[in-house]
UniProtKB/Swiss-Prot annotation:
The gene coding this protein: cinA
Stated name of the protein: Putative competence-damage inducible protein
Protein family according to the UniProt entry: Belongs to the CinA family.
InterPro entries: CinA, CinA-like_C, CinA_C, CinA_KH, Competence-induced_CinA, MoaB/Mog-like_dom_sf, MoaB/Mog_dom
NCBIfam families in UniProt: cinA_nterm (TIGR00200), PncC_domain (TIGR00199), PRK00549.1 (NF001813)
Amino acid sequence: MKAEIIAVGTELLTGQVLNTNAQFLSEKMAEIGVDVFFQTAVGDNESRLLNLLDIASQRSDLILLCGGLGPTEDDLTKQTVASFLGKSLVFEPSASQKLDHFFASRPHYSRTPNNERQAQIIEGSTPIPNITGLAVGGILEVDGVTYVLLPGPPSELKPMVNQYLLPALSGNHTALYSRVLRFFGIGESQLVTILSEMIHKQSDPTIAPYAKIGEVTLRLSTKAETPEQAKAKLDGLEQKILQTPSFEGGLLADYHYGYGETNSLSAEVVNMLKERSMTITAAESLTAGLFQSTIADFPGSSKLFRGGFVTYHIEEKAKMLQLQLSDLELHGVVSAFTAKKMAEQSRHLTASDIGVGLTGVAGPDALEGHNVGTVFIGIATLKGAKSYKVSIGGRSRSDIRYIACLHAFDLVRKTLLNGLNLL
């Protein structure tokens, strides 16, 4: 089934209102296996809507119209669709009763003739009750095309879709199932190149790559009649992807850290620390507390994070972390030595299981002979301490700081998986 969404309202075209209904409807159609091929916004203009209906009816099996069902003069959707189909508007009894009750309970409201239009549907339509508003919706099939009329306010449209439209449409369709794989340490272009043959030959399931700041996700999607069938297909594709060799000689599984649209490296680390009843701390320079504040964003973080240090100036590093100023001056603020010592001392001073040190050059200028984007990350555990150098070039100052934290979380994650042994 080919579906099309038509959002009606001049305010959408002028940018006064964001077209969130189209996104919502597309997501819901995908859930029941209906393919949305087109999305269009049209103003409150009868001739342009008639022209669009003529086009849509020739290319789509399901046309979802939202907006223009209200009482004002520019609410023309219902009348225009009725005119296009050569049908009349009739009053829907339940909607009329709701309108009667609404005005009876509000005697100070004026019931003008245009209010009555909200209780009308196109003749032959199956009504879609409006739980939170007055404008009734409707479903009508004419010449093999199904027309759905919905009000514009999301607070009215969403309950109507969830409670009435989806059950009406879902009976004859397979559902769409998706799984999101998350990767860190590999760029989108490299990942897509490695999987190019698989992506080129895809049919069902499909692979869709998305680039995020510092990481990449792959959305695997399939249509199936049951969740079990979908899981079997997605499991097979996932294993094929993760077992694909990378350019570095390992497998793509080496870069895969988790699942889900809203998951993150920090969430993975926090969950792993909670599962192991371990604590973490950090001493930060270039990231200025971003690593620690990210941990503190999670509920219950006080059980795994006792406190930490933000040490920008070299003298503060020496004083707060109880380090020799002469050693810091000898090796430099931006150095493997300093990152390692920051991790060691933060762990020691807070009696934490893991200590992290972050120092580097966020820009815009180079520092101590290091280019912008040079970052040193220290990791300290009961089994020792080590520093790692990372280069994050061609990024803004804020992106460098954010990606540096991602690298730190990834190193902590791998260290936890390795039983606190350093990598």
